[in-house]
Amino acid sequence: MANHSQLGFQDASSPIMEELVEFHDHALMVALAICSLVLYLLTLMLTQKLSSNTVDAQEVELIWTILPAIVLVLLALPSLQILYMMDEIEEPDLTLKAIGHQWYWSYEYTDFKDLSFDSYMTPTTDLPQGHFRLLEVDHRIVIPMESPIRIIITADDVLHSWAVPTLGVKTDAIPGRLNQTSFITTRPGVFYGQCSEICGANHSYMPIVVESTPLKHFETWSSLLSS
């Protein structure tokens, strides 16, 4: 959960998000090195410690061709690795289906016979003390932690987007199309997200709440809900 005046990312709760945070730091260091080099050269030029009347320097042209190529390789390799990791779906222990509506989500646990529900935002007037405004729902998604989860995402009316930042998940929900993604939660907890595609007047009132629990707790919850 993000805190007031927080400058960094939320704590990663999935391997993919951990990789994304590391890649962000890596890219930031590369950008910092480039800025430092440019500022250093500008300082030398402005203090006249580095000046030249040379109008042709093939060595310089070679340097400003090779250095950007090296920078692009340093950014492209980890980026491609993460892209492949995000597209790779392991054999899931559990499959969910999320359907976006104006303006709520409905969920189906396809591995269970009768386990489905709608998830609406909890109105501020009904919000228990200590809960988060505009982020709480009447029915949370409950999943077992440290288990590969596949989620199939679609929409019933207009474009939506199912996103939970701390899990590193953001997938568009498109009417007539099934998109899928996967994730693994690395710790127990409650993770919040929202619809991330403008979908109408109440777009801001489509929160997503994922509760990661030990397997025994999930089995108890699923048996109670499906009975």
Swiss-Prot record:
Keywords: Copper, Electron transport, Magnesium, Membrane, Metal-binding, Mitochondrion, Mitochondrion inner membrane, Respiratory chain, Translocase, Transmembrane, Transmembrane helix, Transport
Subcellular location: Mitochondrion inner membrane
Residues at which Cu cation A2 binds: C195, E197, C199, H203
Location (main, coarse): mitochondrion
Transmembrane intervals: 15-45, 59-86
Reactions accelerated catalytically: 4 Fe(II)-[cytochrome c] + O2 + 8 H(+)(in) = 4 Fe(III)-[cytochrome c] + 2 H2O + 4 H(+)(out)
Record topological domains on the Mitochondrial matrix side: 46-58
Uppermost EC category: translocase
Membrane-topology annotation of the record: Multi-pass membrane protein
GO molecular function terms attached to this record: copper ion binding; cytochrome-c oxidase activity
GO BP field: ATP synthesis coupled electron transport
SUPFAM superfamilies to which the protein is assigned, alphabetical: Cupredoxins, Cytochrome c oxidase subunit II-like, transmembrane region
Mitochondrial intermembrane side: 1-14, 87-227
Gene Ontology CC terms: mitochondrial inner membrane; respiratory chain complex IV
InterPro entries: CcO_II, CcO_II-like_C, CcO_II_C, Copper_CuA, Cupredoxin, Cyt_c_oxidase_su2, Cyt_c_oxidase_su2_TM_dom, Cyt_c_oxidase_su2_TM_sf
Binding site for Cu cation A1: H160, C195, C199, M206
Cofactor requirement: Cu cation
Chain sites annotated for binding Mg(2+): E197
Enzyme Commission identifier(s): 7.1.1.9
Cofactor note: Binds a dinuclear copper A center per subunit.
Quaternary assembly: Component of the cytochrome c oxidase (complex IV, CIV), a multisubunit enzyme composed of 14 subunits. The complex is composed of a catalytic core of 3 subunits MT-CO1, MT-CO2 and MT-CO3, encoded in the mitochondrial DNA, and 11 supernumerary subunits COX4I, COX5A, COX5B, COX6A, COX6B, COX6C, COX7A, COX7B, COX7C, COX8 and NDUFA4, which are encoded in the nuclear genome.
Similarity-based family: Belongs to the cytochrome c oxidase subunit 2 family.
Its biological purpose: Component of the cytochrome c oxidase, the last enzyme in the mitochondrial electron transport chain which drives oxidative phosphorylation. The respiratory chain contains 3 multisubunit complexes succinate dehydrogenase (complex II, CII), ubiquinol-cytochrome c oxidoreductase (cytochrome b-c1 complex, complex III, CIII) and cytochrome c oxidase (complex IV, CIV), that cooperate to transfer electrons derived from NADH and succinate to molecular oxygen, creating an electrochemical gradient over the inner membrane that drives transmembrane transport and the ATP synthase.
Protein name stated in the entry: Cytochrome c oxidase subunit 2
Species annotation: Coturnix japonica (Japanese quail)
